[in-house]
UniProtKB/Swiss-Prot annotation:
Species this protein is from: Serratia proteamaculans (strain 568)
Catalytic activity: D-ribose 5-phosphate + uracil = psi-UMP + H2O
Subunit (UniProt): Homotrimer.
Catalytic-site annotation from UniProt: E29 (proton donor), K163 (nucleophile)
Keywords from the named record: Glycosidase, Hydrolase, Lyase, Manganese, Metal-binding
Official protein name in the record: Pseudouridine-5'-phosphate glycosidase
GO molecular function terms attached to this record: hydrolase activity, acting on glycosyl bonds; metal ion binding; pseudouridylate synthase activity
Group of enzyme by EC: lyase
Length: 308
């Protein structure tokens, strides 16, 4: 029999009060604080993302693992600790039990954040971009655990599509195969992170948050349903031309192969190359995408929690 203290949830008082009153709450990952941006930009962005959720009327809940405890919502001091502590583990669904057992610190990805959000009773999650099938994934089988986790939780994911470095066509095919409902907000194109279009059409378009909220309600009532992925493109003024990004990515892939860069290092290599090719615009766009998706997630959660 499982002991209750095996999963020590520490829920921030603001988040706890919101959940108890059935108010809208949006979960956020902590991986962007530890692995996405440098200090102090990581703290500034984390606080800006939380502020964006609050602007919508919802309550933010940044999730992370701290000394073996599951934090659901963080104080400023905890965000600072995540931002400045070196060597914090990147935690996905597969290594989450080990990080908890070792009572260490861990920054949650999309997959683990969804698992812990559901554990806490949170129904919405915001991320800049989901993981997916990597380029060459048909041979390497390098597929993000995000896609599998969508089938195991029913927490709605609001994002700006999938990350640019992925094989987005195969990612969409994989989501369809796994019965994951995908909808785009006010666009026919499936977005790609800080690019407003990935070059692939959306499986489904809806133009109002009310319509999306109704679809979420129905999806959650269906037996065996997966999480719904809601993709909202970044604002035009924050977007980067997809042609520039794709050219930089292709050049980086060829350069990585020539230098013998393999495994998880390839992603870091490509992202750094894109940042250099865009003269730092990609890093700024990354932060803007995070803020925009967080605000839309908050708005959607507020609409969902309205009496209908």
């Amino acid at each position: 029999m499982m002991q209750a203290n095996l999963l020590p949830l520490v829920i921030h008082p603001e988040v706890k009060a919101a959940l108890e009153s059935r108010h809208a709450v949006v979960a956020l990952e902590s991986n962007v604080i530890t692995h996405g941006l440098n200090y102090p930009a990581n703290v500034e962005t984390a606080l800006a993302v939380e502020a964006a959720v609050r602007r919508s009327g919802a309550v933010p809940a940044t999730i992370g693992i701290c000394d073996g405890e599951i934090l659901v919502g963080m104080h400023r001091e905890q965000i600072e600790r995540f931002a400045t502590t070196p060597g914090i583990a990147k935690v996905s669904s597969n290594n989450l039990p080990f990080v908890l057992a070792q009572k260490s610190m861990g920054a949650t990805t999309v997959a683990s954040s969804l698992m812990l959000a559901e554990l806490a009773g949170i129904g919405f999650f915001a991320s800049a971009g989901i993981g997916g099938v990597h380029r060459g994934g048909e041979d390497s089988m390098d597929i993000s655990s995000d896609l599998i986790q969508f089938t195991r939780t029913n927490v709605t994911v609001v994002c700006a599509g999938a990350k640019n470095i992925l094989d987005i066509g195969r990612t969409l095919e994989f989501l369809e195969t796994q019965c994951v409902p995908v909808v785009t907000y006010q666009t026919d194109d499936f977005p790609a992170f800080y690019c407003r279009s990935s070059g692939y059409r959306s499986p489904q378009r809806l133009d109002s948050l009310e319509a999306i909220a109704q679809a979420i309600d129905i999806n959650r009532a269906l037996p065996g349903s997966a999480a719904m992925v809601v993709a909202a493109p970044t604002k035009p003024e924050d977007a980067i031309d997809s042609r520039d990004v794709q050219a930089a990515i292709q050049a980086a892939i060829e350069n990585a192969a020539a230098k013998g860069v393999t495994g998880s290092q390839v992603t870091k290599f490509i992202m750094k190359a894109v940042e250099q090719a865009t003269h730092g615009r990609s890093a700024m766009a990354n932060a803007a995408v995070l803020v925009n998706t967080a605000e839309i997630a908050g708005q959607l959660a507020m609409v969902y929690h309205r009496p209908r």
